[in-house]
Amino acid sequence: MSKLKKTKHPFPCFSIWQQFKRKLYRTFALFLVLFLSSVVLFRFVPVPFSAYMLQQKIGYLFEGNLSSTIHYQWVPLEQISQSMQLAVIASEDQRFATHYGFDWDAIQSALQHNQRGKRIRGGSTISQQTAKNLYLWHGQSWLRKAIEMPTTLVLETLWSKKRILEVYLNIAEFGPNIFGVEAASQHYFRKPAKQLSNAEAALLAAVLPNPIIFKVNKPSAYVKKRQQHIQRQMGLLGKQHLSQLD
């Protein structure tokens, strides 16, 4: 009895497309598993580096700048002064304790502010900034924003507010190659982050929107004005505000 010969697919292009889709689904599933696994892992262990740190390092390598060093030192939230914790909430996200990752009022306010042609202001929450810094790339992109939203929701679901704040403070950029509040505190003030005063914490928080242009060691009039505003907001919130974080 003769063996049956395999017949070729009548539509080879369709067959290639099906194979491509299967590979695409598998790749997506692999990335999803790796992402969720890392979120669960980083709920308990210090973050060794962020996607933005990696992006910066790769950029330096492409430029041929092999001597550039990323300054980064992880510290638990208990070793970061309450002044610093309150400063970033007062500066970046005053509804952090109560929202679920997104502050729609702040987003709408930022859009209206930017449409008036004033200094560009963002509406991203601390949760969104943590998602972006930890897993995504910087720059204006609708694709990044589209990925940022579900990433933020996953962090809000699997992490506590305290953990989100802890990771944010440890991976935020405070100057060229200076990541995390401990590295920033040691670099600018020669002291650990747990000893930061209200004024020092407010100054660090003041440069967060653009730490490459805004300088901690040479604050412009605008940065000083932001620092004073943040200190006033810290006084209005009060350190008891931190007790609202779960």
From Swiss-Prot:
<dbReference type="InterPro" id="IPR023346">
    <property type="entry name" value="Lysozyme-like_dom_sf"/>
</dbReference>
<keyword id="KW-0573">Peptidoglycan synthesis</keyword>
<dbReference type="GO" id="GO:0071555">
    <property type="term" value="P:cell wall organization"/>
</dbReference>
<keyword id="KW-0133">Cell shape</keyword>
<comment type="similarity">
    <text>Belongs to the glycosyltransferase 51 family.</text>
</comment>
<keyword id="KW-1003">Cell membrane</keyword>
<protein>
    <recommendedName>
        <fullName>Biosynthetic peptidoglycan transglycosylase</fullName>
        <ecNumber>2.4.99.28</ecNumber>
    </recommendedName>
</protein>
<keyword id="KW-0961">Cell wall biogenesis/degradation</keyword>
<comment type="function">
    <text>Peptidoglycan polymerase that catalyzes glycan chain elongation from lipid-linked precursors.</text>
</comment>
<dbReference type="GO" id="GO:0005886">
    <property type="term" value="C:plasma membrane"/>
</dbReference>
<keyword id="KW-0812">Transmembrane</keyword>
<dbReference type="Pfam" id="PF00912">
    <property type="entry name" value="Transgly"/>
</dbReference>
<keyword id="KW-0808">Transferase</keyword>
<dbReference type="GO" id="GO:0008955">
    <property type="term" value="F:peptidoglycan glycosyltransferase activity"/>
</dbReference>
<dbReference type="GO" id="GO:0016763">
    <property type="term" value="F:pentosyltransferase activity"/>
</dbReference>
<dbReference type="GO" id="GO:0008360">
    <property type="term" value="P:regulation of cell shape"/>
</dbReference>
<dbReference type="InterPro" id="IPR036950">
    <property type="entry name" value="PBP_transglycosylase"/>
</dbReference>
<keyword id="KW-1133">Transmembrane helix</keyword>
<comment type="pathway">
    <text>Cell wall biogenesis; peptidoglycan biosynthesis.</text>
</comment>
<keyword id="KW-0328">Glycosyltransferase</keyword>
<keyword id="KW-0472">Membrane</keyword>
<dbReference type="GO" id="GO:0009274">
    <property type="term" value="C:peptidoglycan-based cell wall"/>
</dbReference>
<dbReference type="GO" id="GO:0009252">
    <property type="term" value="P:peptidoglycan biosynthetic process"/>
</dbReference>
<keyword id="KW-0997">Cell inner membrane</keyword>
<dbReference type="InterPro" id="IPR001264">
    <property type="entry name" value="Glyco_trans_51"/>
</dbReference>
<dbReference type="InterPro" id="IPR011812">
    <property type="entry name" value="Pep_trsgly"/>
</dbReference>
<feature type="transmembrane region" description="Helical">
    <location>
        <begin position="28"/>
        <end position="48"/>
    </location>
</feature>
